[in-house]
């Protein structure tokens, strides 16, 4: 794994762990953070990340194992994350968006990795693809 790839994952994890404290809060409704403090709506410990990072790690793991993009392998890892807490900072899936849940349920029913819905937070979950390919 390249240093750039590893660095992108560390950056995502740090940003996600920092941001979880303020998750679901509107701008201007909180005092800006100057340190990582944990807490937030999920009561996470300092340094723990959310489902967004868990999914990014699933994608990174799939890209490395498959030596490129494999939609079925990727979504199977997302299902493991959702059902078993795979790559979760807590060992369980404590949050998942409705669009993601719907896509995973569709996949379990159809076995078609492209049968899901569109998640508006997708961009934050695919940063590993261009870095992996570079």
Report the location of each language-model feature.
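Structured, active/binding-site neighborhoods that engage oxygen-rich ligands
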Residues: 1-134
């Amino acid at each position: 794994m390249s240093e750039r790839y590893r660095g992108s994952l560390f950056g995502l994890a740090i940003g996600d762990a920092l941001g979880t404290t303020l998750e679901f809060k509107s701008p201007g409704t909180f005092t800006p953070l100057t340190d990582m403090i944990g807490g937030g709506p999920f009561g996470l410990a300092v340094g723990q990340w959310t489902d967004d990072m868990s999914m990014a790690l699933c994608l990174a793991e799939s890209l490395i194992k498959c030596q490129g993009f494999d939609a079925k392998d990727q979504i199977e890892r997302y299902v493991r994350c959702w059902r078993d807490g795979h790559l979760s900072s807590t060992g369980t899936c404590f949050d998942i968006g409705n669009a993601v849940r719907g896509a995973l349920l569709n996949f379990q029913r159809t076995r078609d990795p492209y049968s899901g819905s569109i998640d508006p937070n997708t961009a934050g979950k695919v940063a590993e693809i261009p870095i992996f390919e570079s």
